[in-house]
Amino acid sequence: MGLPWYRVHTVVLNDPGRLLSVHIMHTALVAGWAGSMALYELAVFDPSDPVLDPMWRQGMFVIPFMTRLGITNSWGGWNITGGAITNPGIWSYEGVAGAHIVFSGLCFLAAIWHWVYWDLEIFCDERTGKPSLDLPKIFGIHLFLAGVACFGFGAFHVTGLYGPGIWVSDPYGLTGRIQSVNPAWGVEGFDPFVPGGVASHHIAAGTLGILAGLFHLSVRPPQRLYKGLRMGNIETVLSSSIAAVFFAAFVVAGTMWYGSATTPIELFGPTRYQWDQGYFQQEIYRRVGAGLAENQNLTEAWSKIPEKLAFYDYIGNNPAKGGLFRAGSMDNGDGIAVGWLGHPIFRDKEGHELFVRRMPTFFETFPVVLVDGDGIVRADVPFRRAESKYSVEQVGVTVEFYGGELNGISYSDPTTVKKYARRAQLGEIFELDRATLKSDGVFRSSPRGWFTFGHASFALLFFFGHIWHGARTLFRDVFAGIDPDLDAQVEFGAFQKLGDPTTRRQVV
């Protein structure tokens, strides 16, 4: 036919059988990719340390999505939370991957069948004998079925009535597990961090979809609306479908980047705003303060801080620190975390407790500045030693560790003190293994960052696609050059005001 590459889809424009075929093939490709990617990730995933080497540090992309829907066991005998299991059942990670691949194969065969047997009676208008689709009726059918699926997910899967529930955790990502969720019907259901909203919104949206589907199945659109919105044109379906997809992509880009109940930090890693706001640091200090109030000493209070909580409070886990085009997992960047060294507390020779000013998200380098509790600068690592007033050597800074591997150890050697001050800029200090994966020391983003970038980019692209195809279908007659008034509108001198038919010049 000699069509250019960007026009090849016109071959299914008036061919309902093959239009169905290519959509089934698309589903086969999507399901096949998901299943294959899951098997690849399972082949490279190391489940041995869910605290310091969780799935998001290893760059897993599809495993977190399976996990948040209730899959936690593997046929390899491990559980995502670290325990051993004996009977994982059919719906393990491998089982879900296999189901996607089998489904992909069936869709592949169905696509071939519909490509070969494209001229089916069901696609023909019995009055004209030509291929025709009743698009408003098809819209009603799809809306009804989508509503049933949406309602079923919210009412059965999420609530645990017939299903596992979803991943639910505390605000600091420490106690996450799969559990059933009761719908939240009050105003709290609109809080994006309340899991109950997932159940209630799916039930409500599903109910609305079922009712709307029945409406569109039983009520025909008015003729003027049908013609005005070009409801008989398949490109109208394309345009409105693209609109639904780009809107959803923008929404999930937001819920992923800013965080929500559907994107738990245990599965996707922390958000950048938790570093910016010192979210985990505040909770750590609150716990230490509570311990001191119970007459614990500093060592005891810091030793009770969960390693998982301390690890969140490390800039290397900030998804905004990795460049968008730095390929690889976080472990390929700063290395595999081995252990928490403990919390360093710096003091000058006068006994002031000093705090290292932390590096903001978008800095690659940052001056090492130590301030006291009032925010007054007491020490630093100067750029020019000749002009220094607050150097570690001059001020006599020492460091002592509480909790972690270096618990109870103190250093007064300026070189060592400066080393730990630099590392304290990046949050809690961890021992990182860079040898195993030949990690290069350059921070990487987490799957949270990749998902957001990908969905925001495609949403923008699809937004333009919606405008393009919407304009094509609405102004099809104009673009085709069959508008009877088109020549008159653009003819120079036909109107006093170009294109305004009310100002037509009178012929004398």
From Swiss-Prot:
Matches recorded under Pfam families: PSII
Bilayer topology annotation: Multi-pass membrane protein
One GO cellular component, as annotated: chloroplast thylakoid membrane
Record has Phosphoprotein as a keyword: no
Keywords associated with the record: Chlorophyll, Chloroplast, Chromophore, Membrane, Photosynthesis, Photosystem II, Plastid, Thylakoid, Transmembrane, Transmembrane helix
SUPFAM superfamilies named in the record: Photosystem II antenna protein-like (SSF161077)
GO BP term (any one): photosynthetic electron transport in photosystem II
Residue ranges of the TM segments: 21-36, 101-115, 140-156, 203-218, 237-252, 457-472
MF GO annotations: chlorophyll binding; electron transporter, transferring electrons within the cyclic electron transport pathway of photosynthesis activity
Organism domain of life: Eukaryota
Cofactor remark from the record: Binds multiple chlorophylls. PSII binds additional chlorophylls, carotenoids and specific lipids.
Compartments (UniProt record): Plastid, Chloroplast thylakoid membrane
Known function: One of the components of the core complex of photosystem II (PSII). It binds chlorophyll and helps catalyze the primary light-induced photochemical processes of PSII. PSII is a light-driven water:plastoquinone oxidoreductase, using light energy to abstract electrons from H(2)O, generating O(2) and a proton gradient subsequently used for ATP formation.
Family: Belongs to the PsbB/PsbC family. PsbB subfamily.
HAMAP family per record: PSII_PsbB_CP47
Assembly description: PSII is composed of 1 copy each of membrane proteins PsbA, PsbB, PsbC, PsbD, PsbE, PsbF, PsbH, PsbI, PsbJ, PsbK, PsbL, PsbM, PsbT, PsbX, PsbY, PsbZ, Psb30/Ycf12, at least 3 peripheral proteins of the oxygen-evolving complex and a large number of cofactors. It forms dimeric complexes.
Name of the protein: Photosystem II CP47 reaction center protein
